[in-house]
Curated annotation (Swiss-Prot):
NCBIfam families per the UniProt record, alphabetical: PRK09198.1
Protein name as annotated: Nicotinamide phosphoribosyltransferase
Protein's GO biological process: NAD biosynthetic process
Species of provenance: Mycoplasma genitalium (strain ATCC 33530 / DSM 19775 / NCTC 10195 / G37)
Lineage: Bacteria, Bacillati, Mycoplasmatota, Mycoplasmoidales, Mycoplasmoidaceae
Binding of beta-nicotinamide D-ribonucleotide, residues: 233, 310-312, 364-365, 403
Top EC class for this record: transferase
Amino acid sequence: MMDKRTSEIEFHLKNLLACDAYKLSHRLMYPQDTQNLYSMLTARGVYGDFKEFVWNHDFAKEILLNVFNGFVNSVIEVKKNKLLAAALTDKLVSVFNDHELANEFTQHICHLASFLEKNKKMPLVAKIHESDQSLPFRTPLITIEGVENIPNNFVWLVNYFETVLLENIWLFQTASTVAKRIKSLLEKYAKETADETSFINFQCHDFSMRGMSSLQSALYVARAHLQYFTGSDTILGGDNSRSILASEHSVMCADGSKHELKTFQRLLEKFKDKKLSLVIDSYDMWNVLDNIIPRLKNLILMRGATLYLRADSGNYQTLICNPNYKKQDKSTWAMIDYLDHHFSSTINKKGYKVLNKKIGIIYGDGITYQKIEWILNCLKNHGYCSSNIIFGVGSSTYQNLNRDTLGFVYKLTAIKRNNRWIGVKKTPITDLSKSSKGGRYKTKRLITVY
């Protein structure tokens, strides 16, 4: 078990070394007459289908300041704490098998600590682009450079934080872009088929937490999702997170398959005045829709809130809505047809059917943008309003993202030598899509945060 002292050392090492290993050698590789560096974080948008992306200034600022302040505090601690200094040296020796490099870096960190104790902050200037719902790719998002007359031996700090900034920023901003894209799709079908659009805020529910790679990833995604929707099962995602009571298969199977009707009845009676979601495919969802639900119809109609039925398996192209539906052939019926048959619907002002308010559909099995679009289009062609369904969007959408989805990168774009700034730009002939921007940028939309 880790004691307090060991835990504190590990904490500081994470602040100091949250970077790719090669970053520690770059400070030894820049030209000796380097006076300053200027680097930029941007999204290239090379590989995805997106034409624009979402950028949240406040989130990026929070990350950057946490990273910078944590680094500063831990650098100062190295000078004060001999055990930490020794641990830092030992760690670098184990990674590089180079005692000279390890000792020199630790000494350099102690020298930096003296500077920080005197000046209270790193000799850097960081600017972050203001928030925007639709930025073009290759827009400068974060710029970092040394202060004027930065000590030459600290110039390396400009590029040192690339790794930790990217790893903490790309997922949130990418998930935000995806959530906004889905909301735009929901708005499109709502405007075409619904009388009002307020239901959209709860139409896309975050199911992703269990499929994310870590708690931190889940929280980044949840926070991004909650910028556009209020429905989320990630309780810790934000103060505006909302959910309802819902069963899972362990609940629906607890009484056994022979008592499935009893299970539904028990839950409907126990939570008669609360919104409730019940999963229906633990055994045979078609039996639930064709036999169990109609037997409980009066109980459902007497409830004080909506019952949402959730399918969790099957072919999505026949499950919710079947384009080959024939009224006389029950084998072609989908969920929407059964629920309309049992509970009826009304026609809204735009001529589309809206199910009885006591019943609804929620579907969250492997949901993607493409599946949502297909289902909403099928419902529309079938004469139904888009408000009849809620989607549970999980890791099939949010975990299947990576840094290249929007092409987030952090690159050196200018270097100061001989008292003159020179633009720096990479242009690999093997893949010109990876070309970087060059030079320094001035715009009022880049706000100084450090």
